[in-house]
């Protein structure tokens, strides 16, 4: 039932995402952020005031919430490139990565604690207040929209032509999509398959092992804030190759080290720490590259296409990897997926 509800509420907004790009380019980006946060606050407040709504209203409200989230993500990336000097984008994106991943670590624990102490209505109240305060502080962002020179209104088809006509940009786009398809499914399929089913580690040890990647990402974000001058984008191919090689090695070692589970746990934790570090050193410069190299008049459509294909390929990758893991085993599936990424990295043209 929950899977059907998730599909019904997430798929329709996702299909609209490509058309949000032209809207973001036409509209006042700061105003869009305020609208999205205010709308999310209003939805939480309505659910708080009218508990137990009929299913059609709950479906419609959840779909609207997903749509607002997609719109906020696209508009915020474009606004970020408008407000920030190009030479500081990498370090500022490092700060954003640090805050995003820090919130991802703390929010579930804080939410579980609040739910246990005060119940679900307290969480709804907190969400309504948080979104409302976010909308309020966004009102004070100093913002003067840059003039966008366009011969005609922004159209989705023109955005697709722009992407296909830029070889380096399209190569990076393909690599991001490959990571979404082959690697983003790890926590849903690969890690439980290896650590829980194959090695039968307890939940506490599983949680510790998986958290190593987040710890590595947080450390890398701190590093990137201060070390943007090192220009990790210039070493992008090597970062991709080492990252995927570590993942493939973890997959290949899984069946080989079953007789020494403690050794595999230490290996998994150490490699995940490095993988989290390398992933941040790839993702943060990539976002900065897109924000500086894609013209402002194309950014809304570009980030909308990026969000759309990511949203499509991640669940497809989960389904594909589930079948592959049933056939080959989770370790071999992990290695196979990352070997595919390595081959693609070697074939495509990356920025020098």
What are these regions (language model features)?
Residues 61-66, 176, 180, 268-272, ...:
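Helical-face signature of the major facilitator-like transporter fold
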Residues 55-66, 91-148, 211, 266, ...:
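Hydrophobic alpha-helical transmembrane segments
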Residues 118-125, 161-221:
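A single, central transmembrane helix in multi-pass transporters
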Residues 5, 95-103, 175, 305-310:
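Hydrophobic alpha-helical segments of secondary membrane carriers
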Residues 3-8, 14-41, 46, 55-57, ...:
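C-terminal transmembrane bundle of multi-pass solute transporters/carriers
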Residues 65, 80-85, 89-90, 192, ...:
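Helix-terminus/helix-capping segments at the ends of transmembrane helices and short amphipathic helices
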Residues 66-74, 184, 276-284:
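Small-residue-rich segments within alpha-helical transmembrane domains of MFS-like 12-TM solute carriers
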Residues 73, 104, 108, 179-188, ...:
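Conserved extracellular-gate-facing transmembrane-helix segments in secondary transporters
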């Amino acid at each position: 039932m929950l899977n059907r509800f998730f599909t019904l509420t997430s798929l329709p907004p996702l299909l609209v995402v490509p058309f949000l790009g032209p809207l973001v380019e036409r509209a006042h980006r700061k105003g869009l952020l305020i609208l999205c946060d205010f709308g999310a606050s209003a939805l939480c407040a309505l659910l708080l005031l009218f508990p137990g709504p009929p299913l059609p209203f709950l479906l419609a409200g959840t779909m609207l919430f997903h749509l607002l989230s997609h719109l906020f993500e696209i508009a915020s990336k474009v606004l970020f490139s408008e407000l920030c000097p190009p030479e500081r984008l990498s370090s500022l994106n490092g700060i954003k990565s640090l805050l995003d991943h820090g919130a991802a670590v703390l929010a579930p624990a804080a939410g579980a604690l609040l739910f246990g102490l005060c119940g679900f209505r307290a969480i709804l109240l907190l969400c309504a207040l948080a979104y409302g305060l976010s909308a309020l502080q966004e009102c004070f962002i100093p913002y003067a929209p840059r003039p966008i020179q366009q011969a005609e209104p922004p159209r989705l088809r023109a955005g697709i032509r722009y992407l296909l006509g830029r070889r380096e940009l399209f190569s990076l786009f393909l690599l991001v999509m490959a990571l979404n398809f082959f690697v983003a499914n790890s926590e849903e399929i690969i890690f439980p398959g290896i650590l829980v089913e194959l090695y039968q580690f307890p939940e506490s040890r599983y949680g510790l092992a998986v958290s190593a990647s987040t710890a590595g990402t947080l450390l890398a974000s701190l590093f990137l804030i201060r070390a943007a001058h090192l220009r990790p984008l210039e070493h992008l191919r090597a970062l991709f190759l080492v990252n995927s090689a570590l993942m493939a090695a973890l997959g290949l070692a899984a069946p080989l080290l079953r007789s020494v589970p403690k050794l595999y746990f230490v290996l998994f934790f150490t490699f995940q720490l490095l993988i989290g570090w390398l992933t941040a050193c790839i993702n943060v410069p990539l976002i900065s590259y897109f924000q500086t190299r894609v013209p402002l008049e194309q950014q809304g459509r570009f980030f909308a296409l990026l969000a759309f294909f990511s949203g499509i390929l991640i669940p497809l990758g989960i389904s594909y990897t589930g079948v592959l893991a049933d056939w080959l085993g989770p370790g071999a599936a992990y290695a196979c997926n990352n070997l595919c990424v390595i081959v693609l990295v070697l074939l495509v043209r990356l920025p020098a």
